[in-house]
Amino acid sequence: MSTNPYSAEELNKRLDRVNGWINNCDQKSGILLAFGGAFVAVLLTSDVIGKGYYYLIEPFYSFWLDGVDATFSLKRATLFCGLLPTIYYGLNMVYNLLLVLKPKTKIEDFNDDSSPITNNSKLHFQSIAKKSYREFQIESKVQTESAYLDDLCTQIYCNSKICDDKFENYKKGLDDFTKTLICCFGEIVIYFIFPAHPTNPVE
């Protein structure tokens, strides 16, 4: 026996699947943000930032602004240059992951005038909240089955667009996260593997 693809049961299953993907993306983004927050917390509670400033930033700062003589090395210059993309990719990661968690709830945002989007939805929470309880109750009672199915289709479409945007931003955030780790690993390798300049008193 074939299943009607435009039945309330089938459409509700599709909506549940899309909502499941949205929750999955939100959870992944939350995990990455939590990991990034924990990493920053470790840096703030240790002396890494202080040592990094003293070793990388302070000599350039003193030389450029105060005219203080400073001895530079290839190692220090390389670490300083590597710090810039690390910060850039880290901030970009946070930005993209926050876009994942940013709510996008207005049905009007998805109406491109090419499809019959149901703006006066009986399922969408914002459309319901704009009405009084009595208005919502009356409109729900007189809603036809065809209108209800169209309303379900609208929710599936809008949630699918939301889900697609979320995963696009999540992929960007994950890519920035990977680049940040690579930059951090490169900084660690350069700092511990390459010898310090013998004539540099700071090193």
Labelled PLM ranges:
Residues M1-D16, Q137-E145:
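Short, charged/polar, low-complexity loop and linker segments
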Residues Y6, K13-D16, G20-D109, F167-E203:
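Alpha-helical transmembrane segments and their immediate juxtamembrane boundary regions
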Residues E10-K13, N159-C163:
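A short amphipathic helical element positioned immediately N-terminal to and/or at the very start
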Residues L101-K161:
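Membrane-proximal soluble regions of multi-pass membrane proteins
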